[in-house]
Amino acid sequence: MTSIEPTHLGKKVIVGMSGGVDSSVSAYLLMKQGYQVEGLFMKNWEEDDTDEYCAAADDLKDAQAVCDKLGIKLHTVNFASEYWDNVFEYFLAEYKAGRTPNPDIMCNKEIKFKAFLEFADEILDADYIAMGHYVRRRDIDGTSQMLRGVDGNKDQSYFLYTLGYEQVARSLFPVGELDKSEVREIAKEMGLITHDKKDSTGICFIGERKFTDFLQTFLPAQPGNIETSEGEVIGTHQGLMYHTLGQRKGLGIGGLKNSNDDPWYVVEKDLVRNVLIVGQGGNHPRLMSNGLVANQLHWVDRKGPANGSKITVKTRYRQQDVPCSVTYDSDDVLRVIFDEPVAAVTPGQSAVFYDGEICLGGGIIDALIRD
């Protein structure tokens, strides 16, 4: 492990301690760099907060154990009200409108880099905040850029595109310079209880329960027909909100007569007729698009790429970058044309743009371009 010179003596950093290995190692690395480190554990969810589904109590216990091991103070804060108003209600509204939202992106925007930063500033007198995200910060020409994490498989810039350079400048991302395996090795060397803790996956407020059961608690299901792209009814669905474009599993329509062995995919959701439209093969023509229109734009530098720029885009997490060209229909509407057709571009999800290793920002996919 590389030794780090303590060059930041006296600067106070509040680390978002989640009870996971990434935030644990972030706190340790910042201590080694000479920062005055304190932890802050966020409780963001209370509805149906039972032992069966919610790991918050265990996560807090692990966060406290790590802070005790490192000899730092751990604060706690309850952002459940802010989370409900700014993240969960958005999540429900998007599903109700037939789109597929990404609540993790909204959580970063409204909670981790807004409510958390404000609390760290006003209550804890922080110079910086820090999170266990796999991204990097680069300060250049008086501003701060956000770069992809070194570990390409764990890079989380897709989830942080709504940050402006002002927030990036106030944030530290120690594990963004490391591979995940290195992070776990550091945690093990330091004897941190989280060194072999499983990474959290899925949507935080759903936990281990079935997504359909959870969603039905808040939005009544509206069953309807499943049709092929040729218009033949071949099954029923329990609600369009349970399905997303490109979905293959859970359709319950295998082994049909007069069809080949290719898997079925969701290729369209007809909201007017409440019909789920499916087609066979991952390259089905109705699954492909030549571009997209994005709105609700956020640019890290607050300006965005120039009109006509050739850059790259991700339309979902861990997707290979897609070369594209971009033009503005207005200040808040961007038209994106892919160099090659892309499958399963999904309205409601985010399109995030890159110039090499620099995350430029992004927007919400509003419409697909198929011509």
Swiss-Prot record:
Protein name: tRNA-specific 2-thiouridylase MnmA
Functional note: Catalyzes the 2-thiolation of uridine at the wobble position (U34) of tRNA, leading to the formation of s(2)U34.
Family: Belongs to the MnmA/TRMU family.
Site (Interaction with tRNA): H133, Q349
Stretch list, region Interaction with tRNA: 154-156, 316-317
PANTHER family in UniProt: MITOCHONDRIAL TRNA-SPECIFIC 2-THIOURIDYLASE 1, TRNA 5-METHYLAMINOMETHYL-2-THIOURIDYLATE -METHYLTRANSFERASE
One annotated Gene Ontology cellular component of this protein: cytoplasm
EC number(s) from the headed UniProt entry: 2.8.1.13
Native source organism of the sequence: Shewanella pealeana (strain ATCC 700345 / ANG-SQ1)
Annotated active site: C107, C204
Enzyme class: transferase
GO BP: tRNA wobble position uridine thiolation
Binding locations of ATP: G16, M17, S18, G19, G20, V21, D22, S23, M42, G132
Organism placement in taxonomy: Bacteria, Pseudomonadati, Pseudomonadota, Gammaproteobacteria, Alteromonadales
Keyword RNA-binding: yes
Record key words, sorted: ATP-binding, Cytoplasm, Disulfide bond, Nucleotide-binding, RNA-binding, Transferase, tRNA processing, tRNA-binding
